């Protein structure tokens, strides 16, 4: 059933969700890793994790990475492909790999690899330094991985603007930032991802924060968002008007239905935010919530697609522009398939503004 949300930025249409990865039938799970990238018009790669259903009841990144191709703007998908690097790391027994974000710049695809520890039950934190790998042949083959940053942490978002790749890392080997040295850093590449250099430390009070998203607004400014973990109804952000060299923290945003694992995108004449919400009867990190905004800083009261499920709805999005069609946002996310566990399938839905 299609849902319609009368948001502040317009009438947001939310399509009926479609099953993308049927982990239930193969008795697997799919924690983290929802990267998507369009490398040519209409030609998309979508990544997902193939994880143990038993370790931490399916909420552990104990597994490897798969990906599929679409040649028709995300309508149909190829058979599963294995990201060999992730399998090699898995069987080596030290790291597992999560692919949270991917970009394409001038025909070169860059994947950002989070290196999780296999030595803890969640197979996630503590993180090692992040790596990246590339494809020069539309995802058929991949280069050997390179280190993105000397800081242990997790790359939460990456975008491309004017032939520059921007990647944002939360530099902390554990989930929640607790120390002054735990900061959000911006790394940039001007050579299609061959090399990256640190551009700045984002001017954001990172203590008690985690997750994050990047957004270039219509006025050219760059916004970094960070989740306030103790208060699931607050979201902090910092704005740069010089492509990430300097920053100004803006007033804290108060979100009626909360936000965790924030994802923000430009769509049509407005902006969309989605992630896990905060429900007064269940707590933070539950449900799947969508907001709209006219400026990327002031958000409406939001819409719950689902209110109470926990430890799922990790998500990502990809803007798709098909000729003769309105702009659409493809959203990939995890959805609980078995009560009493944290085992998830992976689903797709589409967003568009009337």
Predicted regions and their residues:
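Asp-box/BNR beta-propeller blade signature and adjacent active/binding-site loops
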Residues: 1-354
